Amino acid sequence: MSAIPNASNTSASTSFDAHRPLTLADINDPSTKHVIVGMSGGVDSSVSAVLLQQAGFMVEGLFMKNWEEDDGTEYCTAMDDLADAQAVCDKIGIKLHTANFAMEYWDRVFEHFLAEYKAGRTPNPDILCNKEIKFKAFLDYALTLGADYIATGHYTRRSVNYKNNDGIEVAQLLRGLDNNKDQSYFLHAVGGDKLAKTLFPVGELKKPVVRQIAEEHDLITANKKDSTGICFIGERRFKDFLQQYLPAQKGDIVTDDGITIGTHDGLMYYTLGQRGGIGIGGVKDRPEEPWFVLAKDLDNNRLIVGQGHEHAMMLSNELQAYKLDWVDVLPPADIFSEDGLRCMAKSRYRQPDQACTVFANNENGSEVRVVFDEPQRAVTPGQSAVFYIDEVCLGGGVIASIDAPCGI
C-alpha cells in the first residue's frame, strides 16, 4: 500500500495484511458460515444476498423497520420495501426475518438529530444510524439468531481481520471501488470490531454491474430507484417535517455589513453555504448576484448572508471536531505527536480529499484540531470530518467549530 507524502503510520497500520481487502473467497468453509443480510428492499442488498449465496454461504435476510409512521401515508415506503425484500428472498430461496428497531432509532438517533438542529447545527443522522442501528442493534440481533457475519449493501470494503495494539480483533474500513458510490464516509463511526463481523459483497463492484446482476437473476429490485435523503423524511419537504417537532422562530436576514434585507423562517432550516431557498429577491444598491448563507447568529436569531461563492466568511483553515470514532478503536499514535498526523480529510460527503494535519486536543484522542493545507469552503458544524490514508478510512468525528474565517 502506497503512502501519501509525509503520511505517518497509525496504530491501525500494524502490517500490510491489516490493509489487504477481504474478499468472499478469503473466508474458509463458507458452507458452514451463517450470514444474515440487512435487506432494505433495494437492489444493493438484493445483489449482496445473491453474491453470498453464490459463494456458498448459508444466507438469510433481515428487514429492519426503524421508523414508526402510519404505513398508509404517502411518505412511508416501509410496506413496499418489505414486499420487495420478501419477493427477492422468495426468488432466491432464503428466509426473511423482520425486526423493529424504531425505539432504538428514536432514542439513539432521532433525539440527537432534533437536539443538533435546535442548537443551530446540521447533523447527519445516517452516520449515527449506521453506528447505532445497522452495526449495533442489527448486529447484536443477528448474533442471537446464530449469525457468524452480517452483510449489507454498502459500497465500501473492509480488510482482513487483525488484532490491534490492545489485542482486539478488528478490520480496517476501506473505500469502495466505485468512487462515485463510495459510502465509507457514512461508515466511519463503525468500530473495527464490528467490521470484523461484517461483509460488504458489492463493495468491489460498480453500480451498473450490480443492476446487471439483479437483471440476470430477474430480481424485482433490478431497476428500483435508489433511496435518497434522510430515511425517515422520505420525499416530503424537509421544512414541513422538521416543524412538526421543533417550533421555528422567524428572525432577520442580515448582510455581512449589517443591513437587514429580509426575514428568515427559522435558523434550523438553513445551512452554511446554502444558495437556494433563502428568500432574498433583488436588493437595492446590490449587484444581481446570488446570496449565500455565511453564518448563523444564534444569540440574536439572525441569518448572516453575503454575495460571492468564495466569500471570505465561508472559508476556514481549521476545524475542531469531537466525539471521534476511530475504526481501529485506538486513535492513531501520531495525532499525539508535535507534528501531528498527515492524512486526507472530507468535511462532507463526496468532497474531494483535502490534505490536512490532525492534532489531538485531549489525552484519549476523542477531540482533535484539523489544520488544512488549503482554505475550506462552508465547513458546517454538526457534519462529520472523516480521515483517510490512501484507501483506508481511519475514522472521524463531529465538527464542533471552525477557526476565524479567512481574511476577517
UniProtKB/Swiss-Prot annotation:
One of its GO terms (cellular component) is cytoplasm. Residues 124-126 are annotated as: Interaction with target base in tRNA. Its EC number is 2.8.1.13. The record marks H154, Q383 as: Interaction with tRNA. It is found in: Cytoplasm. It catalyses: S-sulfanyl-L-cysteinyl-[protein] + uridine(34) in tRNA + AH2 + ATP = 2-thiouridine(34) in tRNA + L-cysteinyl-[protein] + A + AMP + diphosphate + H(+). Disulfide bonds join C129-C231. One of its GO terms (molecular function) is ATP binding. InterPro entries: MnmA-like, MnmA-like_C, MnmA-like_central, MnmA-like_central_sf, Rossmann-like_a/b/a_fold. It is an enzyme of class 2 (transferase). Residues 181-183, 348-349 are annotated as: Interaction with tRNA. It comes from the Bacteria. GO terms for biological process: tRNA wobble position uridine thiolation. Gene3D superfamilies: Adenine nucleotide alpha hydrolases-like domains, HUPs, Translation factors. Keywords: ATP-binding, Cytoplasm, Disulfide bond, Nucleotide-binding, RNA-binding, Transferase, tRNA processing, tRNA-binding. The active site is at C129 (nucleophile), C231 (cysteine persulfide intermediate). The keyword NADP does not apply. The keyword Iron does not apply. ATP binds at G38, M39, S40, G41, G42, V43, D44, S45, M64, G153. Belongs to the MnmA/TRMU family. Catalyzes the 2-thiolation of uridine at the wobble position (U34) of tRNA, leading to the formation of s(2)U34. This is tRNA-specific 2-thiouridylase MnmA. It comes from Psychrobacter cryohalolentis (strain ATCC BAA-1226 / DSM 17306 / VKM B-2378 / K5).
